[in-house]
């Protein structure tokens, strides 16, 4: 009887990793589908954030300090809008995050503003320009957001979305196929006979792997005879980076998967 030496899971993982080859193929992908992918190129911000000076707090803006008081306009400067041709003799209420027009460079927060009879009284108010969020304060145009070979996590994904990146370059995902082997197996969707067994392993493996950024194919159920096994691996081997086989891997004389792999591949470790 042949005895096989077991190895630890840690050792098995180390062996597999040591024989792996980093893919150099690059592809473009929609940002929404890039979670956990690896960037194949450096990504820089195409814009400044914010793109214009903006209000860090709710408050008022005025154009200059020449006047002692400013009538408060009924117009409110809101986020998501562009306001032009504002009267420099007026004070304008502005909401947090709203863009500040280029000729209104003085900001007064609500707490520091003194309003009397619909006038902003400058002598009793306190200008606080430190509360203006400057153009590019969060991100500078051409600033590096993602380095080459960096993993796209959910934080990086949101960062890229904030600068309008729609498509990014990543390394092509590994192509993985999953197959079950066994004469007794039948797809769980089909009606089985008493001597048959529903194939559950493949479904479990496929759904486990869905959390990884890979291209995943269900390769069906393979009958455990040498001719079919040989035909399967010869036709599929060059099409996939990895084929995971469930079942049909014992060391009995009737196991044709192990027989074919032992004859035609390099076995890295026994289990």
Feature annotation, model-predicted:
Residues 259-271:
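Glycine-rich phosphate/nucleotide-binding loop
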Residues 76-88, 92-93, 105-107, 206-262:
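N-terminal small/polar loop signature for handling phosphorylated ligands or for N-terminal nucleophile
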Residues 93-95, 147, 178-181, 245-246:
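Short beta-strand segments
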Residues 67, 97-99, 183-184, 247-254:
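Short glycine-rich anion-binding loops that position phosphate/pyrophosphate groups of nucleotides
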């Amino acid at each position: 009887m042949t005895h096989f030496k077991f190895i630890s899971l840690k050792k098995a993982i180390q062996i597999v990793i040591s024989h792996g080859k980093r893919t150099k193929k690059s592809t473009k992908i929609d940002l929404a589908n890039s979670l956990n992918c690896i960037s194949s190129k450096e990504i820089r911000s195409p814009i400044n954030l914010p793109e214009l000076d903006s209000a860090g707090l709710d408050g008022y803006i005025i154009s200059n300090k020449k006047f002692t008081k400013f009538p408060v306009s009924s117009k409110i400067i809101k986020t998501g809008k562009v306001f032009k041709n504002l009267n420099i003799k007026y004070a304008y209420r502005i909401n947090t995050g709203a863009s500040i027009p280029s000729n209104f460079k003085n900001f007064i927060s609500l707490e520091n503003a003194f309003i009397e009879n619909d006038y902003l009284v400058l002598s009793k108010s306190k200008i606080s320009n430190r509360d203006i969020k400057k153009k590019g304060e969060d991100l500078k145009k051409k600033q590096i957001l993602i380095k080459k070979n960096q993993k796209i996590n959910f934080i990086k994904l949101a960062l890229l979305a904030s600068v309008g990146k729609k498509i990014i370059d990543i390394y092509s995902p590994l192509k993985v196929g999953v197959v079950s082997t066994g004469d007794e197996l039948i797809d769980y969707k089909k009606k089985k006979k008493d001597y048959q067994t529903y194939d559950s392993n493949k479904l479990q493996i496929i759904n486990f792997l869905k959390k990884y950024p890979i291209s995943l194919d269900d390769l069906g159920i393979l009958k455990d005879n040498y001719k079919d096994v040989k035909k399967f691996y010869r036709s599929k081997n060059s099409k996939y980076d990895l084929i995971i086989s469930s079942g049909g891997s014992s060391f009995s004389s009737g196991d044709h998967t192990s027989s074919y792999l032992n004859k035609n591949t390099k076995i890295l470790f026994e289990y």
